[in-house]
Curated annotation (Swiss-Prot):
A Pfam family matched in the record: MoCF_biosynth
Protein name per its UniProtKB record: Protein TV0584
InterPro entries: CinA (IPR050101), CinA_Arc (IPR023055), MoaB/Mog-like_dom_sf (IPR036425), MoaB/Mog_dom (IPR001453)
UniProt-listed NCBIfam families: PRK01215.1
Family: Belongs to the CinA family.
SMART domains per record: MoCF_biosynth
Domain of life: Archaea
Length: 256
């Protein structure tokens, strides 16, 4: 299994002005691609912080996906921060420049617009089907680094276009949830651990939906990775069957 790290960049996210839906989308995308999302980082539009985030991410993950900070303004410095992290310089990428010129037909390519074509030589531009700034796909020491715009519709479109580039073999993910009523989370906690011991490779997580001591209700999420979707699905279904059986036993004992 390969590990992934998600980085989001932007003062507006840290201040709470913008809800960080990008991190959720990227995390979900990578999980269903078969990656284990190990770490999420959110940093300011600050060169040192961005550089630190990429260094940390490359220490922890096989694939790193960032969003935010690819535009033409003074505080769009994600690519510069990545270059600093790997000890590289940004250079004008002609393919990226051509993509930008295509977007700005009959409009002057100012230094601010040309900035969006600057990147380290280890990166190649990815055409943005929605906005103007290209995404970047970079390869550093056997790791993939994907740098995406922060505008959600642009980020999503670019990430979807890179699905094949980010595919991995022999790692598939499957999950399923069930609802249980009438059992408190603290009561069911030992059975969650028991199922994880009984079915190798599954992860079981309980999510309380109501106030525990008043009207207990649980959503039980079961997930697994395996070499195929069917193998992961089989593990999850086995675990769910055991969870249902334990829940029925607990509820039956309460009725007696």
């Amino acid at each position: 299994m390969k590990d992934a790290v998600v980085i989001t960049v932007g003062n507006e996210v840290l201040k709470g002005r913008t809800v960080n839906t990008n991190a959720s989308f990227i995390g979900n995308f990578l999980t269903y691609q078969g990656y284990r999302v190990k770490l999420g980082l959110t940093v300011m539009d600050d060169l040192e912080d961005i550089s630190w985030a990429f260094k940390t991410a490359m220490d922890r993950g096989d694939v790193i996906v960032s969003s935010g900070g690819l535009g033409p303004t003074f505080d769009d410095m994600t690519v510069e921060g990545f270059a600093k992290a790997i000890g590289s310089d940004n250079k004008l990428n002609q393919d990226a420049l051509a993509m930008i010129e295509e977007k700005y037909k009959n409009i002057e390519i100012t230094p601010e617009r040309k900035k969006m074509a600057m990147m380290p030589e280890v990166c190649k531009p990815i055409r943005n089907p929605v906005g103007t700034a290209p995404g970047l796909l970079c390869s550093v020491g056997g790791k993939k680094v994907v740098i995406l715009p922060g505008v959600p519709m642009e980020m999503q479109a670019l990430l979807e276009s890179m699905r094949d580039s980010l595919a991995i073999e022999n790692s598939c993910y499957f999950d399923e949830s069930i609802n249980i009523t009438g059992i408190m989370e603290s009561t069911f906690a030992p059975y969650v651990e028991r199922v994880m011991r009984e079915v190798d490779g599954v992860y079981v997580k309980s999510h309380p939906k109501n106030i525990e001591v008043v009207n207990p209700s649980l959503e039980i999420e079961v997930s697994a990775y395996d070499v195929s979707q069917e193998a992961a699905r089989k593990k999850v279904k086995d675990a769910i069957a055991r969870i249902r059986a334990y829940a029925e036993t607990i509820l039956d004992s309460k009725d007696k």
